[in-house]
Design a protein with these regions (language model features):
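OB-fold and OB-like single-stranded nucleic-acid-recognition modules
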Residues: 18-153
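Sec-dependent N-terminal signal peptides
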Residues: 2-13
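Amphipathic, low-complexity, repeat-rich surface-exposed segments
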Residues: 1-2, 133
Length: 153
């Protein structure tokens, strides 16, 4: 019993040590429009899966709108998971999107499911937020940047 308790305590300590290890420096400062402008896609292509690991730290204003992830975005995420050989569970990692305004444009961004509740409680409609986003690719109509972390401003 004591051995089990020590193992459980060690596992909890290790999990806690890694929980705060988000690598903010891996995200290059930009704007959402700047991040979009860096990439090109063929308009005839329905889906473009990005494998280049492009990460950006961007600012924006939360509009207060959220929704379930749009069907084309879900399909892109499915293809991204398959192409990069991520675990199949990653397909459901981005079940919701939040709308952010930046530079006069509005963007729907998938947010990791474990962060939805904290985002909703910490960021109010009209509030400024710093987003740590990663390019997953593009659908026929839009680029898809997923939120990996956020900081209320």
């Amino acid at each position: 019993m004591t051995r089990y308790l020590l193992f459980a305590l060690a596992a909890t300590a290790l999990a806690g040590a890694h929980a705060g290890d988000f690598d903010y420096k891996a995200y290059r400062p930009s704007s959402l429009s700047g991040a979009v402008a860096e990439h090109q896609k063929n308009p005839a292509v329905d889906f473009l899966v990005e494998t280049g690991n492009f990460k950006y730290a961007v600012g924006g204003t939360y509009t207060g709108r959220h929704r379930e992830t749009a069907t084309p975005t879900r399909e892109l995420i499915r293809r991204w998971v398959k192409a990069l050989r991520h675990p199949k569970e990653y397909e459901t990692l981005f079940d919701h999107e939040v709308e952010v305004e930046s530079g006069g444009k509005k963007y729907w961004l998938p947010i990791q499911t474990p962060m939805v509740q904290s985002f909703a409680s910490e960021v109010r409609a009209g509030g400024s937020v710093k987003l740590y986003i990663m390019l997953l690719g593009a659908t026929k109509d839009t680029w898809v940047f997923a939120i990996n972390e956020f900081q209320r401003q």
